[in-house]
A protein has these predicted regions:
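Basic, helix-initiating cap at the start of DNA-binding domains
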Residues: 1-29, 33-45, 58-62
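C-terminal peripheral helix-coil segments that are non-catalytic and often amphipathic
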Residues: 1-2, 99, 134-146, 164-171, ...
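Key DNA-contact positions within bacterial/archaeal DNA-binding proteins
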Residues: 48
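Helix-loop "lid/cap" segments that line or gate small-molecule binding pockets
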Residues: 76-78, 95-102, 110-117, 192-195
Length: 200
C-alpha cells in the first residue's frame, strides 16, 4: 500500500472512531451533556485531534446525519417504482430523507441550528449537498422521460424547488415531533404541487 493510501486509511479510521465514539456517548447521555474531551477519550485520541477533523461537536452530529442520508439517498435511485405517480415518487423521495431520522430527532435539531447559524456549509455538507442534487436531478430526469410530462423548467430549478420545500418539511418535522402527522401531510401536498408543474 502506498504512503498516501495508508495515510488516507488512517485518517478515515480516526474520523470513524471519533464519529462512533460521539454517537455512543450522545445516545447514552444526550448531545448537550457530552464534551469534546469525553469524545476524545472514548475514541482514544487527543482533544486536538478531534478538532483536526471537526470544528465543533455539532459538526460530528452533522456527519452522523450525512451518513444516515447517504443510505436514504441510495434508495432514491430506485424511484419511481412501477405504477407510482409523479407525486408519489416525489413524496417518497422527500419522506425517505426525513423518515430515516426518526430515532435521531435531537440530532436533526442540532443539524438545523448548525445549518442556519453557519456562514458557510462545512466541506462535508457541501460535498453531500452536491450528491443530493445529482440524485434528485436523476430522479427528475427519469420522471420527465415519462409520457405526458413537460419540461417547463430546467432540472436544476426543479431540484432547487424540491430542496427548498424539503428543508421546510424537515424543520416542520423536527419541531412537530411524533407522530409527525402534519409533516407527513405537508410532504404529500407539497410534492403533489411540484408534480402538477411537471405534468401536461
Amino acid at each position: 500500500m502506498t504512503a498516501v493510501g495508508l495515510r488516507e486509511r488512517k485518517r478515515l479510521d480516526t474520523r470513524h472512531r471519533i464519529v462512533g465514539a460521539a454517537s455512543g456517548l450522545f445516545e447514552k447521555r444526550g448531545i448537550d451533556a457530552v464534551t469534546v474531551d469525553e469524545i476524545a477519550g472514548a475514541a482514544d485520541i487527543g482533544k486536538g485531534t478531534v478538532y483536526n477533523y471537526f470544528e465543533a461537536k455539532e459538526d460530528i452530529v452533522v456527519a452522523l446525519l450525512v451518513e444516515l442520508d447517504r443510505t436514504a439517498l441510495a434508495s432514491i435511485a430506485e424511484l419511481p417504482s412501477q405504477g407510482m405517480s409523479v407525486a408519489e415518487a416525489l413524496d417518497s423521495a422527500s419522506w425517505r430523507l426525513i423518515d430515516n431520522k426518526v430515532e435521531y430527532l435531537p440530532y436533526v435539531r442540532v443539524y438545523l441550528s448548525r445549518l442556519f447559524a453557519a456562514a458557510e456549509a462545512a466541506p462535508e455538507l457541501a460535498e453531500f449537498s452536491d450528491q443530493v442534487d445529482a440524485a434528485l436531478a436523476a430522479l427528475f430526469e427519469r420522471l420527465l422521460a415519462r409520457p405526458g410530462m413537460k419540461r417547463a423548467l430546467p432540472v436544476d430549478t426543479l431540484v432547487l424547488s424540491f430542496r427548498t420545500m424539503h428543508i421546510g418539511l424537515v424543520a416542520q418535522w423536527a419541531l412537530e415531533g411524533p407522530p409527525y402527522a402534519t409533516s407527513r401531510m405537508l410532504s404529500r401536498r407539497h410534492m403533489a404541487l411540484l408534480a402538477k408543474g411537471l405534468e401536461l
